Protein backbone atom coordinates (compact mmCIF):
# COMPACT_ATOMS: atom_id res chain seq x y z
CA UNK A 1 0.00 0.00 0.00
CA UNK A 2 1.02 3.62 -0.52
CA UNK A 3 1.06 6.52 1.92
CA UNK A 4 1.24 10.18 0.92
CA UNK A 5 4.33 12.17 1.84
CA UNK A 6 3.34 15.69 2.89
CA UNK A 7 5.72 18.57 2.17
CA UNK A 8 5.42 22.15 3.47
CA UNK A 9 5.32 23.54 -0.07
CA UNK A 10 2.21 21.54 -0.88
CA UNK A 11 3.90 19.05 -3.20
CA UNK A 12 3.15 15.46 -2.33
CA UNK A 13 4.91 12.20 -3.01
CA UNK A 14 4.20 8.61 -2.00
CA UNK A 15 5.98 5.85 -0.13
CA UNK A 16 5.28 2.12 -0.26
CA UNK A 17 4.60 0.52 3.11
CA UNK A 18 3.62 -2.89 4.42
CA UNK A 19 -0.08 -3.74 4.45
CA UNK A 20 0.50 -5.69 7.66
CA UNK A 21 1.88 -2.71 9.59
CA UNK A 22 -0.37 0.04 8.22
CA UNK A 23 -3.45 -1.71 6.83
CA UNK A 24 -4.46 -4.02 9.66
CA UNK A 25 -8.08 -4.29 10.80
CA UNK A 26 -8.70 -2.46 14.08
CA UNK A 27 -9.03 -4.70 17.14
CA UNK A 28 -10.43 -2.56 19.95
CA UNK A 29 -10.10 -5.22 22.65
CA UNK A 30 -6.44 -5.84 21.84
CA UNK A 31 -5.60 -2.12 21.81
CA UNK A 32 -7.44 -1.64 25.10
CA UNK A 33 -5.49 -4.49 26.68
CA UNK A 34 -2.18 -3.05 25.44
CA UNK A 35 -3.00 0.44 26.74
CA UNK A 36 -4.12 -0.86 30.15
CA UNK A 37 -1.02 -3.07 30.44
CA UNK A 38 1.28 -0.18 29.53
CA UNK A 39 -0.32 2.23 32.00
CA UNK A 40 -0.36 -0.42 34.74
CA UNK A 41 3.35 -1.03 34.22
CA UNK A 42 4.01 2.70 34.59
CA UNK A 43 2.48 2.82 38.08
CA UNK A 44 4.94 3.44 40.89
CA UNK A 45 3.30 0.99 43.29
CA UNK A 46 5.07 2.31 46.40
CA UNK A 47 1.97 3.22 48.43
CA UNK A 48 2.19 1.87 51.99
CA UNK A 49 -0.02 2.07 55.09
CA UNK A 50 0.23 0.44 58.51
CA UNK A 51 -2.08 -2.19 59.96
CA UNK A 52 -2.99 -2.26 63.66
CA UNK A 53 -0.06 -4.62 64.21
CA UNK A 54 2.44 -2.20 62.66
CA UNK A 55 1.40 1.09 64.29
CA UNK A 56 3.61 1.91 67.27
CA UNK A 57 2.08 1.71 70.74
CA UNK A 58 -1.18 0.15 71.81
CA UNK A 59 0.30 -2.72 73.78
CA UNK A 60 -1.52 -1.89 76.98
CA UNK A 61 -5.27 -2.23 77.47
CA UNK A 62 -6.46 1.41 77.88
CA UNK A 63 -8.94 0.63 80.72
CA UNK A 64 -10.33 -2.39 82.46
CA UNK A 65 -12.89 -4.56 80.72
CA UNK A 66 -15.84 -3.89 83.03
CA UNK A 67 -17.08 -1.29 85.42
CA UNK A 68 -16.17 1.99 83.71
CA UNK A 69 -19.36 2.36 81.68
CA UNK A 70 -17.30 2.90 78.54
CA UNK A 71 -17.15 0.63 75.52
CA UNK A 72 -14.68 -2.20 75.96
CA UNK A 73 -11.29 -1.61 74.33
CA UNK A 74 -8.16 -3.71 74.12
CA UNK A 75 -5.78 -1.33 72.32
CA UNK A 76 -5.57 2.33 71.37
CA UNK A 77 -4.39 1.31 67.89
CA UNK A 78 -7.67 -0.29 66.80
CA UNK A 79 -8.71 0.82 63.27
CA UNK A 80 -11.79 2.56 64.73
CA UNK A 81 -9.62 4.78 66.92
CA UNK A 82 -7.99 8.01 65.83
CA UNK A 83 -4.31 7.22 65.28
CA UNK A 84 -5.07 3.53 64.89
CA UNK A 85 -4.02 1.22 62.10
CA UNK A 86 -5.71 0.89 58.72
CA UNK A 87 -8.13 -2.03 58.36
CA UNK A 88 -7.02 -3.21 54.91
CA UNK A 89 -3.71 -1.39 54.67
CA UNK A 90 -2.27 -0.78 51.21
CA UNK A 91 1.14 -2.33 50.65
CA UNK A 92 3.78 -1.84 47.92
CA UNK A 93 2.94 -3.98 44.92
CA UNK A 94 3.86 -4.51 41.30
CA UNK A 95 0.98 -3.64 38.96
CA UNK A 96 2.71 -4.98 35.84
CA UNK A 97 0.54 -7.05 33.50
CA UNK A 98 1.91 -9.67 31.13
CA UNK A 99 1.41 -8.91 27.46
CA UNK A 100 2.94 -11.18 24.84
CA UNK A 101 5.35 -9.59 22.39
CA UNK A 102 3.18 -10.61 19.43
CA UNK A 103 0.11 -9.04 21.02
CA UNK A 104 1.96 -5.79 21.75
CA UNK A 105 3.24 -5.67 18.17
CA UNK A 106 -0.24 -6.36 16.81
CA UNK A 107 -1.69 -3.58 18.99
CA UNK A 108 0.81 -1.08 17.55
CA UNK A 109 -0.10 -2.26 14.04
CA UNK A 110 -3.80 -1.71 14.81
CA UNK A 111 -3.18 1.79 16.17
CA UNK A 112 -0.99 2.89 13.25
CA UNK A 113 -3.47 1.45 10.75
CA UNK A 114 -6.39 3.24 12.40
CA UNK A 115 -4.46 6.52 12.53
CA UNK A 116 -3.86 6.14 8.80
CA UNK A 117 -7.56 5.47 8.12
CA UNK A 118 -8.56 8.53 10.15
CA UNK A 119 -6.02 10.73 8.30
CA UNK A 120 -4.21 11.37 11.59
CA UNK A 121 -0.93 9.84 10.36
CA UNK A 122 1.20 12.43 8.56
CA UNK A 123 4.27 11.21 6.69
CA UNK A 124 7.09 13.71 6.03
CA UNK A 125 10.53 13.36 4.46
CA UNK A 126 12.30 14.67 7.56
CA UNK A 127 11.56 16.74 10.65
CA UNK A 128 14.09 18.72 12.67
CA UNK A 129 14.88 22.23 13.90
CA UNK A 130 18.15 24.14 13.55
CA UNK A 131 18.22 25.36 17.14
CA UNK A 132 16.80 24.15 20.48
CA UNK A 133 14.16 26.89 20.49
CA UNK A 134 10.44 26.48 21.11
CA UNK A 135 9.72 29.26 18.62
CA UNK A 136 11.56 27.36 15.87
CA UNK A 137 9.48 24.24 16.48
CA UNK A 138 6.21 26.21 16.57
CA UNK A 139 7.08 27.74 13.19
CA UNK A 140 7.96 24.31 11.81
CA UNK A 141 4.65 22.84 13.00
CA UNK A 142 2.76 25.81 11.53
CA UNK A 143 4.05 24.80 8.08
CA UNK A 144 1.99 21.62 8.44
CA UNK A 145 -0.88 23.38 10.25
CA UNK A 146 -0.25 21.38 13.44
CA UNK A 147 -0.68 22.35 17.10
CA UNK A 148 -1.31 18.97 18.76
CA UNK A 149 1.03 16.27 17.49
CA UNK A 150 3.47 13.48 18.29
CA UNK A 151 6.62 13.67 16.16
CA UNK A 152 8.35 10.34 15.53
CA UNK A 153 11.82 10.32 13.97
CA UNK A 154 14.30 7.50 13.40
CA UNK A 155 16.80 9.03 15.85
CA UNK A 156 15.64 11.78 18.20
CA UNK A 157 17.81 14.88 17.83
CA UNK A 158 18.71 16.92 20.90
CA UNK A 159 17.49 20.16 19.28
CA UNK A 160 14.06 18.68 18.61
CA UNK A 161 13.80 17.24 22.11
CA UNK A 162 14.78 20.50 23.82
CA UNK A 163 12.54 22.61 21.57
CA UNK A 164 9.48 20.50 22.39
CA UNK A 165 9.76 20.49 26.19
CA UNK A 166 7.76 23.69 26.66
CA UNK A 167 4.88 22.62 24.37
CA UNK A 168 2.46 20.46 26.36
CA UNK A 169 0.49 19.40 23.26
CA UNK A 170 3.59 18.36 21.33
CA UNK A 171 5.53 15.17 21.97
CA UNK A 172 8.68 13.81 20.33
CA UNK A 173 10.03 10.28 20.23
CA UNK A 174 12.21 7.93 18.28
CA UNK A 175 10.75 4.70 16.92
CA UNK A 176 11.98 2.59 19.83
CA UNK A 177 10.39 4.95 22.35
CA UNK A 178 6.89 4.88 20.86
CA UNK A 179 4.17 3.31 23.00
CA UNK A 180 0.39 2.75 22.56
CA UNK A 181 -0.58 5.56 24.96
CA UNK A 182 1.50 8.24 23.23
CA UNK A 183 0.24 7.17 19.78
CA UNK A 184 -3.42 7.61 20.72
CA UNK A 185 -2.87 10.61 23.00
CA UNK A 186 -2.27 13.21 20.29
CA UNK A 187 -4.48 14.61 17.55
CA UNK A 188 -1.91 13.86 14.81
CA UNK A 189 1.16 11.65 14.55
CA UNK A 190 3.98 12.94 12.34
CA UNK A 191 6.32 10.21 11.11
CA UNK A 192 9.42 10.71 8.99
CA UNK A 193 10.09 8.35 6.07
CA UNK A 194 13.16 6.74 7.77
CA UNK A 195 11.05 6.20 10.92
CA UNK A 196 8.31 4.68 8.77
CA UNK A 197 10.78 2.17 7.35
CA UNK A 198 11.97 1.33 10.85
CA UNK A 199 8.37 0.73 11.92
CA UNK A 200 8.08 -1.71 9.01
CA UNK A 201 11.19 -3.58 10.16
CA UNK A 202 9.86 -3.91 13.70
CA UNK A 203 6.18 -4.51 12.96
CA UNK A 204 6.10 -5.71 9.41
From Swiss-Prot:
Molecular function via GO: rRNA binding; structural constituent of ribosome
Biological process terms in GO annotation: translation
UniProt xrefs under InterPro entries: Ribosomal_uL4 (IPR002136), Ribosomal_uL4-like (IPR013005), Ribosomal_uL4_dom_sf (IPR023574)
SUPFAM superfamilies: Ribosomal protein L4
Pfam family, one: Ribosomal_L4
Gene3D superfamilies, per the entry: 3.40.1370.10
Keyword tags: Ribonucleoprotein, Ribosomal protein, RNA-binding, rRNA-binding
Start and end residues of each stretch annotated as Disordered: 47-69
Oligomer status and interactors: Part of the 50S ribosomal subunit.
Cited function: One of the primary rRNA binding proteins, this protein initially binds near the 5'-end of the 23S rRNA. It is important during the early stages of 50S assembly. It makes multiple contacts with different domains of the 23S rRNA in the assembled 50S subunit and ribosome.
PANTHER family named in the record: 50S RIBOSOMAL PROTEIN L4, LARGE RIBOSOMAL SUBUNIT PROTEIN UL4M
Similarity remark: Belongs to the universal ribosomal protein uL4 family.
Name under which the protein is recorded: Large ribosomal subunit protein uL4
Organism: Cellvibrio japonicus (strain Ueda107)
